[in-house]
Amino acid sequence: MSVKKISEAILGVGVDDTTIDLFESQYPVPTGVSYNSYVILDEKTAILDTVDNRATEPWLANLTEALAGRKPDYLVVSHMEPDHGANIARLAALYPEMQVVGNAKTFLYMDQFFGADAVAKERRVVVKDGESLSLGTHTLTFVLAPMVHWPEVMVSYESSEKVLFSADGFGRFGAVARFDKNADWASEARRYYLNIVGKYGPQVQALLKKAAALDIATICPLHGPVLTGDLSKYLNYYDLWSSYKAEEPEKILVASASIHGHTKAAAHTMAEKLRAKGAKVVEMDLTRTDVSYAVTEAFRCGRIVLACATYDGFLFPPMETLLTHLKTKNFQGRTVGLMENGTWAPMAAKLMRAELDGMKNITVCDAVVTIRSAANAAAEAQMDVLADELLAK
């Protein structure tokens, strides 16, 4: 990414990272990720956020080009997480007259990351919810957004151009240069939201209510493309995702964790039975699918079938991983069917139910499919019963 002109006064100076394989050291990003940063040029010059250490040098080059000899007056810190805040201390050292804008928690975390001497007290501008900063013809109003998805997060609204600088909100996996505007924005925005921010639905809902009072023409997130045009579709997605409602309530996810293939084969048979009854079904092999994709599909669907082998008296680990992630992300309000396999002591259904009992408003079907080694006619009969119960919910 080079300098991107968002308007005459607002420039994007972010950087694409196409060599990263795992975002937050856990989420695959096959098309990379962007670290976005912005500059507002007015009587006063403001930089909004820095970038990850992986992108420091190209970001500084973009910044130098955008500033064109100016010295920045302010650095606004929306989010202290290192993929955005890693270069705060370096920028403060490069521009010793620059003031740093954040809220009280921003500076608490800044001191924890860099030490209290990185940004001297007299250089700090501590803002509260609803306070504004005039740059000249441009004015930034700060809206605190705690736990979207860190406690110190705040977004900034520029009123003259109706721009919302949304921090991690409305972010998306994928390098911006590789994003086709005709492509599906929601696919990787959904996976980003549900895995990064998904736990904090009530906090996102609160922020959406604040945003509804603003006249927004452009959204500038810290990851992914700048959003313009009809913004209602993006806002509607966020309203849906943060409410924990199923995006496709009639769709069923059949997810299997199979050691030698027999549980997966049984899960496929179950999926085919559901399809034969008119259901829309997606199958996922948890041993071959990263958990972030499975979490995303689980939230997207209204009903789920979990098929798992028993392993050393516990759940086969890929299923345990999925259930742990779902619980962490506040998964709720779904109907779940259970299938278990075990050659001598099948226990997976009991163990999965125990995990699901710790989640909110989860309905577990009474019918359970129990397989001993490989599915037979008796197991298939149980599948028919489970399919009917699941579709009746």
Predicted feature locations:
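FMN-binding flavodoxin-like domain, especially the glycine-rich phosphate-binding loop
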Residues: 176-180, 184-219, 223-226, 269-284, ...
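Short, charged N-terminal beta->alpha structural module
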Residues: 255-277
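Short acidic active-site motifs
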Residues: 87, 290-294
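Conserved beta-strand hairpin/beta-sheet module of binuclear metal-dependent hydrolase folds
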Residues: 3-65, 155-158, 162-165, 263
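Active-site neighborhood of phospho(di)ester-bond hydrolases with catalytic His/Asp-centered motifs
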Residues: 48-50, 72-80, 99-103, 164-168, ...
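Metallo-beta-lactamase
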Residues: 4-8, 102-153, 200-206
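Short N-terminal or domain-adjacent regulatory/targeting segments
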Residues: 220-248
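Active-site metal-binding motif and surrounding structural segment of the metallo-beta-lactamase
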Residues: 43, 54-101
